[in-house]
Amino acid sequence: MSGDGEWRQELDEQQLEDVRRLLLAVREADGRPEVEPAGALPGEFDGGEHLVACVEGEVVGYAHLNTTGNSFGHQVAELFVHPAHRNRGYGAKLLQALDERAAVGFRVWAHGDHPAARKLALKTGLERKRELLILHVDVEGADWPEPILRDGVSLRTFVPGQDEDAVVRVNARAFDWHPEQGALTVEDVRADERRAWFDEDGFFLAEERGEVIGFHWTKVHEPTPGRFGGERVGEVYVVGVDPAAQGGGLGRALTLAGLRYLASRGLRQIILYVEGDNAAALAVYTKLGFTRHETDVQYGR
């Protein structure tokens, strides 16, 4: 296995298309990552460093290293091997390259918790450091009541160009413990506003005395081969409540508002991501009908 000889901070046009074709092939086989046939790669591949692995001129693997690190200070990596070239040791070689390049304490994602990833982690001495659960609910048969708000609190939808700062402020307070979500910036929100999936009508804000105290940002995923029967899927993307405003069922009310909105769009399935050790959130979502569907794992030393 060879590559372009070095880690790169940017991919040239040809490398970008080569990586896109590889990721599309991976998506066809595994259902992820969510990469489009044209345009920019998904946001998780922005910045950082890239390594493209080739055999006889054919791209067989790709690794990305987020050198900035998450809010806990861990550099985070992703690696992919083309489905037609698996079980030939390329994943191990990419992981070795990451191990040599990344800072001590780096983490690497294994989406879907595939047996091959578990085997590779065990072989190389990596341990499970984090589990991110994908929960799922069928809309048909769900009976989600109208949200009930405590006195003085009202709901409205997000206004682009007006509410970014307030959302980021609440998000930072609500997720100061979270390695990725807590790092959300105004620039990140504005970047998502430019994405095709963004829908301000599905972005709910809770206000009290004119101040935003919580939000529920929903998302709709276009059909992805190999996942959810090839249907469009709604997502409880982010629910954040200012710690000073917690209590009185505000988080539940915001969640219900988003679920009812997604159901009104004719979606038959809704998902969400939750940390595997967040027992309180798991209890809330279980009561709303969600069950475990998939698990993403971060490995590290």
UniProtKB/Swiss-Prot annotation:
Enzyme class: transferase
Assigned EC number: 2.3.1.189
Repeat recorded as keyword: yes
Coiled coil: none
Classification via CDD domains: NAT_SF
Highest rank taxon of the organism: Bacteria
Positions that bind 1D-myo-inositol 2-(L-cysteinylamino)-2-deoxy-alpha-D-glucopyranoside: E180, K219, E235, Y273
GO terms under biological process: mycothiol biosynthetic process
SUPFAM superfamilies (UniProt xref): Acyl-CoA N-acyltransferases (Nat)
Residues bound to acetyl-CoA 1: L79, F80, V81
Keyword line: Acyltransferase, Repeat, Transferase
InterPro entries named among the record's database cross-references: Acyl_CoA_acyltransferase, GNAT_dom, MshD_Acetyltransferase, Mycothiol_AcTrfase
UniProt function note: Catalyzes the transfer of acetyl from acetyl-CoA to desacetylmycothiol (Cys-GlcN-Ins) to form mycothiol.
Name listed for the protein in its UniProt record: Mycothiol acetyltransferase
